Amino acid sequence: MALCKKTVGSVLEEWCLNEPLFGCKRHQNVRKKLRLIRIIGLLVSVVAISTFSLSISAFFKMETHSTVLASSLESQKLVHGHQRTLLDFMEQNEGSTPDSPTSMKHEAEHDNATEEHSKGEYPEDLFSLEERRKGAVILHVIGMIYMFIALAIVCDEFFVPSLTVITEKLSISDDVAGATFMAAGGSAPELFTSLIGVFISHSNVGIGTIVGSAVFNILFVIGMCALFSREILNLTWWPLFRDVSFYIVDLILLIIFFLDNLIMWWESLTLLTAYFCYVTFMKFNVQVEEWVKKVLNRNKVEKATTGDAEGKSPTAGDKDDQTLTTKPRLQRGGSSASLHNSLMRNSIFQLMIHTLDPLAEELGSYGNLKYYDTMTEEGKFKERASILHKIAKKKCQVEDSERQNGAANHEKGAKVEVAVTPPSDSGPVQNGIAHNVDEENEEDEDQPLSLAWPDTPRKQLTYLLVLPIVFPLWVSLPDVRNPRSRKFFPITFFGSISWIAFFSYLMVWWAHQVGETIGISEEIMGLTILAAGTSIPDLITSVIVARKGLGDMAVSSSVGSNIFDITVGLPLPWLLYAVINNFSPVTVSSNGLFCAIVLLFIMLLFVILSIAFCKWRMNKFLGFLMFGLYFVFLIVSVLLEDKVIQCPVSI
């Protein structure tokens, strides 16, 4: 890999310039990097949208409270002239306007609501409510954001690698591993937030977080992928059809179970069964996909075969190009739902410290090799694309054998790999280069978490900010990416779960304190701030995937990752609660969460229609449309939760 000495010019190049100054030539597919300023702008935009929604909620709450307070003061003035008696109080209530009696009634309801809002087994805060309202709440906000980062690091650097080892030990197929263990690794914060909401805070914060995270993944993530992609990406229908079909069924079940405000144990078991049905389908996903495509595209395959047979030598290059452009689509279409949980997320610390687009820099080291070509070679991007690469290679081979003779197309694939190597390299040199590339990949991939001091001021500042999180994890958890620590994967697995539970508890607790200070419920905090915060790592890695041209992976993973949340993140805590409490039902009554789930279902349909309207392309218009839908969802959900507007369907 070409290296450049860090100078003032290279630092300026890294921050500002699109073209290199000192001869470090970038690959033609690598134009811009996801610089830190873009990620900061992304986070600011998410916080701004959520804050705007919360401000609207707070405004309506303040207006209602001021009206009630004014009526209460006015009623007190009427009886201030003489000593209040029980008769005076009864006469006052009888002669008042309909709004006046709510002064005492509202006080009682407000006290009950305060007790309801403040309930939960949280420790006593260091700051009183008045101190938090005078500015101390900013510390809780900073701590909450810090917990978002902590959850991302512990999941990506320790939990997901330990799950990878477990899948290898159990010899689980790649599709099933992606739908189970890797999905659990990516959705662990939402799952533990739901557990805390059921057993500790006794609120619907988990439901709000999962529903809000689902909408965030579908609308905001897809919108960001459409805006940040280097080119207009064409999408294939299979992954979207597969995941959306399961997701729609799961949402319909959830809506039906929500109708009576109670979740019975068998309803939780039904949702878990739906998840196992999805896992079973993923077990045979390759066979089902190939069978469906064979039935639907039989005529197209025959045309491609006859066309190739008619003109073999003049169209050989064109056929190779078609194969190169088709293979990535099949790889994306057939990939498991949790792509960036296994491919990208276990390098989040490197994303924060060293580079925000690691695969882009690695692409530049392969000279004339294209990204899609490297994806077809065994050994390239071995660890970072461990699960994805196996699935992609398997699907490419199935595609080749289905279209024509497997051997003929395999030879073409091999010829393409030789053709894209520099012509000046002979066979031995080419093998040497391939060997060096594999060594570089192994060194990069198998290298455990490094706490080495960075070389630039920006990286050093980020390093110091993240070190209080990384160092305790590095000390307490064995890094299974180190071959000597690989055998300690059970310690890493259970230790990561403990850290995730601890960080999730702090996140929900501080979110509760922030909501209590501002005057909003935990459900709204879950729908907005917590949902966005727990989904930021998925957002960043999905954008990176989209910038690599893998639009299908970004879309299918956005939808597929929500299946785990709906069918495991919600029903598992409910089922555990029912088992512990003699199978008693779980109360899920909430002002706006039911309509929020219905709204999520409607937004999912809008996403499908929008993608179809854009002719299955991820363009800028689709991105802005997704942003608009997400903004509408936030506003409507907050207004529903605060009863500013009434839910048309009463439960």
Curated annotation (Swiss-Prot):
Spell out the Polar residues composition-biased ranges.
93-103, 323-338
**Chief localization:** membrane
Intervals, Extracellular compartment: 60-134, 201-206, 267-459, 509-523, 584-592, 642-651
Indicate, by first and last residue, each region the UniProt record lists as having compositional bias (Basic and acidic residues). Answer: 104-122, 304-322
List of glycosylated residues: N112
- Which segments does the topology annotation call Cytoplasmic? 1-38, 156-179, 228-245, 481-487, 545-562, 614-620
Spans of the Alpha- repeats are 176-216, 531-562
User: Which parts pass through the membrane?
Assistant: 39-59, 135-155, 180-200, 207-227, 246-266, 460-480, 488-508, 524-544, 563-583, 593-613, 621-641
* Cellular localisation: Cell membrane
The protein's matches in Pfam families, at most eight in alphabetical order, are given as: Na_Ca_ex
Expression tissues? Retinal cones. Found in the cone inner segment layer and in a subpopulation of ganglion cells.
Which GO terms are recorded in the biological process aspect for this UniProt protein? calcium ion import across plasma membrane; calcium ion transmembrane transport; intracellular calcium ion homeostasis; long-term synaptic depression; long-term synaptic potentiation
Residues of the region (Disordered) are 92-123, 304-338
Topology relative to the lipid bilayer, per the entry, is:
Multi-pass membrane protein
Q: Which reaction does it catalyse?
A: Ca(2+)(out) + K(+)(out) + 4 Na(+)(in) = Ca(2+)(in) + K(+)(in) + 4 Na(+)(out)
GO terms (molecular function) for this protein are: calcium channel activity; calcium, potassium:sodium antiporter activity; symporter activity
GO CC annotations on file: photoreceptor inner segment; plasma membrane
Q: Does the record bear Cell membrane in its keywords?
A: yes
Q: Which UniProt keywords apply?
A: Antiport, Calcium, Calcium transport, Cell membrane, Glycoprotein, Ion transport, Membrane, Potassium, Potassium transport, Repeat, Sodium, Sodium transport, Symport, Transmembrane, Transmembrane helix, Transport
What NCBIfam families does the record point to?
Answer: calcium/sodium antiporter
Q: Which family does it belong to?
A: Belongs to the Ca(2+):cation antiporter (CaCA) (TC 2.A.19) family. SLC24A subfamily.
Query: What name does UniProt use for this protein?
Result: Sodium/potassium/calcium exchanger 2
According to its UniProt entry, this protein's organism is: Gallus gallus
